[in-house]
Regions:
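Small beta-barrel nucleic-acid-binding modules, primarily SNase/OB-fold domains
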Residues: 1-144
């Protein structure tokens, strides 16, 4: 992903578009990155299967567009989606945070009944636009 991104942006004048927040809690810049041809780098990484959607409310301006790109990459078997391998059968999602957890994860047990969503696979969770919890790392072969 890093090399692909570098090939896209190196030597280019890019435009940054900010959403509701300009930085995350760690001081990192949150932005949509556009190339001179108008294409969105974030979307190109998703289409290549080199990234997955990781929403951070309230920064959801392009969430449907980006999720559509992720779903297309999944459907076409691009990048990380090419040789998908499921190891576990059930995951718990949190509708409020759009994160999913392994069933035995302490964070999964804390998800309220109102926000609890059960997925039969990681694939189903990603397809629904959820991203993996960083507490229990239900990633399988997907690198962070």
């Amino acid at each position: 992903a890093r090399a692909f991104n570098a090939r896209l942006v190196e030597g280019q004048v890019v435009r940054l578009e900010f959403d509701a927040e300009r930085q995350d809690g760690y001081g990192r810049t949150l932005a949509y990155v556009y190339l001179p041809d108008g294409s969105m780098v974030n979307e190109r990484l998703l289409l290549a299967g080199l990234a997955y959607c990781f929403y951070k409310t309230p920064n959801t301006r392009h969430e449907q567009r980006l999720l559509a790109a992720q779903r297309r990459a999944m459907r076409e078997g691009q990048g990380m989606w090419r040789s998908w391998n499921e190891k576990e059968a059930r995951y718990t999602g949190n509708a409020a945070t759009r994160r999913f957890h392994r069933q035995g994860c302490s964070e999964a047990r804390r998800v309220s009944a109102r926000n609890r969503v059960t997925f039969t696979s990681r694939w189903a969770a990603f397809l629904a636009g959820y991203s993996p919890s960083r507490e229990c790392l239900p990633l399988g072969h997907v690198a962070r």
